[in-house]
């Protein structure tokens, strides 16, 4: 059986990076991979294990075909390295921090992907965005508005609520992976 792409998505501040970090050790121990995405954000940005590059470098990587998936959101460009294709061919499950707005394009490239939507109560989301201090109030409001516009109603995806316990959410994600519940 081949590997699966587990496409984790959710609003900025929903806890995707925290969740990926919480499951990292067990996913790697089971032979899976968690992808470090490329983002046009300063490498000093708090809270995300990503490779920060300049917009010019991102465009160069894109032109070189370095990305299996790429998109733009919230004024930034994001890329998933092409290396994921090798891991999937090798039979490894691969977790990525994806984008709700790019899900349809990701499904076209990876029809068997497992879409996982991380949800969080709106008041919790606002509090998390304010606490991390990475965006201005205007940017936070724009992110909250984008979250309200991208509900993914009717989409075939697993939903995990991360409003409370990260440990419980991590266990739920690991159960999905183990049971191949997305298949």
Curated annotation (Swiss-Prot):
One of its GO terms (biological process) is 5-phosphoribose 1-diphosphate biosynthetic process. It catalyses: alpha-D-ribose 1,5-bisphosphate + ATP = 5-phospho-alpha-D-ribose 1-diphosphate + ADP. GO terms for cellular component: cytosol. It comes from the Bacteria. Pathway: Metabolic intermediate biosynthesis; 5-phospho-alpha-D-ribose 1-diphosphate biosynthesis; 5-phospho-alpha-D-ribose 1-diphosphate from D-ribose 5-phosphate (route II): step 3/3. The keyword DNA-binding does not apply. Keywords: ATP-binding, Nucleotide-binding, Transferase. Its EC number is 2.7.4.23. It is an enzyme of class 2 (transferase). GO terms for molecular function: ATP binding; ribose 1,5-bisphosphate phosphokinase activity. It holds the Pfam family AAA_18. PANTHER family: GUANYLATE KINASE-RELATED, RIBOSE 1,5-BISPHOSPHATE PHOSPHOKINASE PHNN. Belongs to the ribose 1,5-bisphosphokinase family. Catalyzes the phosphorylation of ribose 1,5-bisphosphate to 5-phospho-D-ribosyl alpha-1-diphosphate (PRPP). This is Ribose 1,5-bisphosphate phosphokinase PhnN. It comes from Azotobacter vinelandii (strain DJ / ATCC BAA-1303). The lineage of its organism: Bacteria, Pseudomonadati, Pseudomonadota, Gammaproteobacteria, Pseudomonadales. The gene is phnN.
């Amino acid at each position: 059986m081949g590997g699966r792409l587990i496409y984790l998505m959710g609003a900025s501040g929903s806890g995707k990076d925290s969740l990926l970090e919480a499951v990292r050790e067990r996913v790697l121990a089971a032979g899976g991979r968690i992808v470090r995405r490329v983002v046009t954000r300063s490498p000093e940005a708090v809270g995300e294990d990503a490779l920060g590059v300049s917009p010019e470098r991102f465009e160069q990587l894109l032109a070189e075909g370095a990305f299996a998936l790429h998109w733009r959101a919230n004024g930034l460009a994001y890329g998933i390295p092409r290396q994921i294709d090798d891991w999937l061919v090798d039979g490894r499950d691969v977790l990525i921090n994806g984008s709700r707005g790019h899900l349809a394009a990701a499904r076209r490239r990876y029809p068997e992907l497992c879409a996982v939507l991380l949800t969080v109560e709106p008041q919790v989301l606002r509090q998390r965005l304010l606490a991390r201090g990475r965006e201005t109030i205007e940017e936070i409001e724009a992110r909250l508005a984008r979250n309200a516009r991208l509900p993914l109603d009717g989409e075939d995806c697993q939903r995990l609520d991360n409003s409370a316990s990260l440990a419980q959410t991590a266990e739920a994600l690991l159960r999905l992976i183990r049971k191949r519940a997305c298949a």
